[in-house]
């Protein structure tokens, strides 16, 4: 049963990473994927926030300081960014050390502003952890909030249509 749970969790994360990568999902597709992946903790019609950021010294850290390989560093970053908040569900997409995205989805009813505020507070906690454990700085490029996952999917559709 644990393998199924781990597989389902991995598939849930992959779905959200697809959205972070810019997959142009329509409302019906989002609903169908969330149903099939048994995602009761989040609702697609609630506001979401997406942050784009980088670790300016990430390549140096990976090459010169971190001795455990890229995969373990990614796992350590996911442990920092995807945990620690009872009110929000977070998914980290590591494109490379110079480009990462974090999606924040509320586990409870929140306004768009509350979701954006929760994302900012979470990133502040993550920054403190990165500095404490790895002496790394976080360079936040932007935080964008959306009315819903559907709105994020629509924006992706418009962006990829050009």
Each PLM stretch: what is its role?
Residues 77-78, 115-134:
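Alpha-helical scaffold within the catalytic cores of cyclic-nucleotide enzymes
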Residues 1-107, 111, 148-162:
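Interdomain helical linkers/hinges and coiled-coil/dimerization scaffolds
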Residues 121, 125-128, 142-148, 155-162:
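Cyclic nucleotide signaling catalytic output domains
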Residues 92-97, 128-140:
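Catalytic core regions of nucleotide second-messenger enzymes
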């Amino acid at each position: 049963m644990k393998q199924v749970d781990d597989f389902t969790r991995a598939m849930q994360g992959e779905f959200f990473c697809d959205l972070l990568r810019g997959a142009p999902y329509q409302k019906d597709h989002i609903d169908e994927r969330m149903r099939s992946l048994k995602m009761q903790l989040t609702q697609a019609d609630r506001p979401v926030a997406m942050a784009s950021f980088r670790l300016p010294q990430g390549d140096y850290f990976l090459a010169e300081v971190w001795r455990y390989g890229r995969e373990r560093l990614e796992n350590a970053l996911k442990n920092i960014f995807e945990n620690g908040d009872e009110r929000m569900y977070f998914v980290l997409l590591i494109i490379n050390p110079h480009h990462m995205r974090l999606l924040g989805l509320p586990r409870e009813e929140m306004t768009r502003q509350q979701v954006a505020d929760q994302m900012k507070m979470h990133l502040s906690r993550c920054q403190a952890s990165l500095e404490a454990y790895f002496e790394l700085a976080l360079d936040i490029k932007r935080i964008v909030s959306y009315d819903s996952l559907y709105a994020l999917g629509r924006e992706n559709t418009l962006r990829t249509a050009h």
